[in-house]
């Protein structure tokens, strides 16, 4: 369970203080970022009341983005203004915004996503239905989002969440990741999604997830962009 903490709070001060900060990041994550220094980066969840001082503290710890969750079974939907109210503060810091949604909801949130002034990183390839063809209308809309908006990126992650064929190959997910990597080689990221929260079908072997990479990024150049160049540009140039 995620709890809110000030970046430098100790337990007694926090428990005695009735005000909670307007961001969500586990204390352990903040500590890890501070210990790692410039070697690690983080993404936080923030609320509209967040102050510039709180964001500055997070920036100093290594946070470089915020996350909006639109998956209905995990979060209550909110009006666009709720999210837009946060974007100017985030843009001032040079951060990006991560968005998590399911493919059928993309059309509904299209206007919001295309109005965001920062780099926008989509989790898990927009959660496509991998039983549908990669050239089908659902994934075509997601590809259009990236084609028409040069600030939109995609994580080619989460095959364990999307696959119907299952581990260890996750073969039905590979064509979707490959299409993104080869079409937008400078705007894709990879991640394990460890520790795999809310997984019900199986607990994936992270080594098997790594093995999917060369099947999506089939050349050394594409792999280097996916794993090195792109994350350096997004997380360390901000």
Language-model region placement:
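Alpha-helical packing segments of well-folded alpha/beta enzyme cores
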Residues: 1, 8, 29, 54, ...
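Mid-to-C-terminal alpha-helical segments outside catalytic/metal-binding sites
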Residues: 1-11, 179, 185-189, 201-238
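Structural recognition of the beta-strand scaffold that forms the well-ordered cores
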Residues: 13-14, 67, 121, 155
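Active-site gating/metal-coordination segments in enzymes
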Residues: 19-104, 110-111, 155-167
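Short, electropositive alpha-helical surface patch
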Residues: 23-43, 173-181, 205-215
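Conserved, mostly hydrophobic/aromatic
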Residues: 29, 58, 66, 90, ...
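Catalytic pocket-lining loop regions of alpha/beta-barrel enzymes
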Residues: 79-190
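An amphipathic alpha-helical core segment
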Residues: 197-199
């Amino acid at each position: 369970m995620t709890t809110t903490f000030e970046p430098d709070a100790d337990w007694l001060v926090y428990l005695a203080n009735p005000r909670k900060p307007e961001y969500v990041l586990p204390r352990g994550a903040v500590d890890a970022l501070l210990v790692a220094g410039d070697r690690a980066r983080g993404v936080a969840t923030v609320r509209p009341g967040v102050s510039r001082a709180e964001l500055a503290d997070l920036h100093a710890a290594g946070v470089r983005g915020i996350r909006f969750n639109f998956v209905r079974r995990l979060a209550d939907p909110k009006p666009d203004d709720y999210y837009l109210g946060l974007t100017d503060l985030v843009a001032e810091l040079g951060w990006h915004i991560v968005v998590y949604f399911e493919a059928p909801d993309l059309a509904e949130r299209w206007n919001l996503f295309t109005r965001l002034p920062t780099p926008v990183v989509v989790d898990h390839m927009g959660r496509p239905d991998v039983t549908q063809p990669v050239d089908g209308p659902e994934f075509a809309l997601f590809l259009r989002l990236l084609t028409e908006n040069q600030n939109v990126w995609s994580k080619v992650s989460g095959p364990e969440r999307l696959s119907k064929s299952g581990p260890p190959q996750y073969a039905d997910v590979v064509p979707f990741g490959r299409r993104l990597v080869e079409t937008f080689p400078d705007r894709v990221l990879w991640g394990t999604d460890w520790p795999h929260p809310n997984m019900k079908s199986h607990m994936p072997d992270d080594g098997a997830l790594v093995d999917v990479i060369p099947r999506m990024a089939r050349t050394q150049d594409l792999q280097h962009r996916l794993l090195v160049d792109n994350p350096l540009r997004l997380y360390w140039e901000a």
